[in-house]
Amino acid sequence: MPSAVLIVASTRVHVDAPEILRIQDTIAALLKEGCAVDVLVPRLSPLFTASLPTGARVFTAPHIPFCGDLPARPSLRRLLAAFVLFLRCYSLVSRRAYDVLHGFDDGVLVVRALDRVTVRTYPYVAEIHRPLSSPGFFKGPRSALARSLERGALRHAAAIILPDEATLARFGGKIPKARVSIIPDPHADFAPESFTYGEFATAIRHVYDYVLRPRRPEA
């Protein structure tokens, strides 16, 4: 397991209760393994701070007045919010040595961009719950660009986490399935198809062990 992880939330995490709960569950699983966990969010919300596991450090990005209520679909405002997250993320990795980055939804684009511009190569986990190709999103150049960036980020991810087979099917075989792990939420007491917390924590540990596995040197 890594000694230090930076989780980068999506640009809409403050209005997305399922993502907040998923991040909290992931933090708890990593802390249980002895990892130091930092979390970067665009801004805090009462739900996020109310149940935040003790031991995690939370950082926020500078506030942009007109990027408060972002649409679910790809937009220029979401792109700007992601860029601000990227700048804050760059500042964090410049001050602390993280072993793994973990992006959620469009936070995956942030960690991919960071991996490209820094001297050090960061292995990153890409976790997608609401693909930018989700049904109902408007078609157009912005959506096409967002989908292209998302798929590019997934192709270069050390590991990919998806919540179910339906989410995997939305990508239409355009991502490396060998690196995909299907990990449902750890709420089996509410939904039979979910994991127990123990199953969830074990699955997260296996993903990180896979990311940090020794690799054979190229011939």
Give residue ranges: language-model regions.
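N-terminal subdomain of nucleotide-sugar transferases
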Residues: 1-50, 151, 155, 159, ...
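N-terminal strand-loop element at the rim of the active site
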Residues: 9-14, 29, 33-77, 166-172, ...
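Nucleotide-sugar donor phosphate/pyrophosphate-binding loop at the beta->alpha transition
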Residues: 18, 122-123, 132-152
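Membrane-proximal helix-turn-helix segments that form the acceptor-binding/catalytic region
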Residues: 25-28, 87-94, 109, 117, ...
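An aromatic- and histidine-rich active-site surface loop
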Residues: 45-47, 78-86, 90, 100-121, ...
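A short, active-site helix/loop in glycosyltransferases that binds the activated sugar's phosphate group
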Residues: 112, 135, 155-179, 187-189
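A charged, aromatic-enriched C-terminal amphipathic alpha-helix characteristic of glycosyltransferases
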Residues: 189-213
